[in-house]
Amino acid sequence: MKPHLKQWRQRMLFGIFAWGLLFLLIFIYFTDSNPAEPVPSSLSFLETRRLLPVQGKQRAIMGAAHEPSPPGGLDARQALPRAHPAGSFHAGPGDLQKWAQSQDGFEHKEFFSSQVGRKSQSAFYPEDDDYFFAAGQPGWHSHTQGTLGFPSPGEPGPREGAFPAAQVQRRRVKKRHRRQRRSHVLEEGDDGDRLYSSMSRAFLYRLWKGNVSSKMLNPRLQKAMKDYLTANKHGVRFRGKREAGLSRAQLLCQLRSRARVRTLDGTEAPFSALGWRRLVPAVPLSQLHPRGLRSCAVVMSAGAILNSSLGEEIDSHDAVLRFNSAPTRGYEKDVGNKTTIRIINSQILTNPSHHFIDSSLYKDVILVAWDPAPYSANLNLWYKKPDYNLFTPYIQHRQRNPNQPFYILHPKFIWQLWDIIQENTKEKIQPNPPSSGFIGILIMMSMCREVHVYEYIPSVRQTELCHYHELYYDAACTLGAYHPLLYEKLLVQRLNMGTQGDLHRKGKVVLPGFQAVHCPAPSPVIPHS
């Protein structure tokens, strides 16, 4: 009996020793990980987007794929105004002072690294000696894709059981090297679903200087651009020349002579036969302010405008243009509360979630609607098959509110703007209409002597947050996928007459209105004798 008891005790002691060794190895394994690093997830980009608590109403991003919002989503107004998503370029008072001490904002590298480096799980890849972020979803580390120092589902984790000490040490060394390598180089095998930070500090700096190209975009956006070029949904047949050699004065004169605002006036088929001549406003949009407006503001809906404290400055302008469903209530400190004109895409009129009929956002303001039409600007074809049927709600609204100025932009005006962008860009741009932002800028340039545009070209507060009033992140909202946004911004940057300080700190571009542009008279044609 005693020998059996002795063997049992030996086995028990051996088991205790084995379990103790196992727990020791597990403790060493996990304490080797850097606690400062965010824990990544193996979720793909699409899965990450589905898990985000997007605001209940549908996003009005023209051409974007819309996804149903999960029930019980967070209210953006509660979640956003004072939140700084990780990976965003938020600048506090101390940062702005540091920025002002630097001539171009990049003599002190810690200015940006303090904003991004510790907050976003980033990977970089080199492009023309610059490094671009491949970060996880800002502000949502638990939904971030990546393998920074942790095994992914495709990699085997540690086996259960005891490892020899030498093997454990080798694993620790390999793990540390792998983590360091992955934090600096983007793996070539990564697919296009990885969510990238919208831009690195180097890219933002080059955007301010007007020195970027589509080749510097992340692979996901590059693929989207190529797909749109291949699809050519609107049948674009560009026959002009692509060049970018015009000076600012020449470009302004080109815009003044060719980018003339035009709306449906009811005189063309099929609208003439439908009685639209009596339906549309009697006074054209271009003649609402015959004497012109002195100073105007165009306020983008970009998330970067949060925490800007620009509201008072914006409201000081004679007229303010806003976009789609962007609210002012609750955001007055950053965006102001004055609204003179509101540009709305056709989704606003057709999607019930925007409450176009009864929302106060669309009352007591000038409304300008638009819808993507064929490049040929064939009105009959467009009327039969619009992107979103804005014609029926337009008729209903005009009948109920005959005194409210409400216009639909003519497709020829929209595609004329696209032609000008393409003519002044060496690369092929997406064959899709310009964004509402670019359209709004040109409308205000036709009505005002000076136009101040806020957060079209992003400031140091640059973030992937698409809109300040919606909890939705995507780099495409800043750099473009459907719209040729990148090329629009480069064109506007060439026209900027404001200071670099305003561009950096406020995201503000100052443009002359067409009334203030003086162009040489065209040379008379001398007939041959």
From Swiss-Prot:
One of its GO terms (biological process) is sialylation. O-glycosylated. The chain crosses the membrane at residues 12-32. It is an enzyme of class 2 (transferase). Glycans are attached at residues 69, 211. Gene3D superfamilies: Glycosyl transferase family 29. Transfers sialic acid from the donor of substrate CMP-sialic acid to galactose containing acceptor substrates. Has alpha-2,6-sialyltransferase activity toward oligosaccharides that have the Gal-beta-1,4-GlcNAc sequence at the non-reducing end of their carbohydrate groups, but it has weak or no activities toward glycoproteins and glycolipids. This is Beta-galactoside alpha-2,6-sialyltransferase 2. It comes from Homo sapiens (Human).
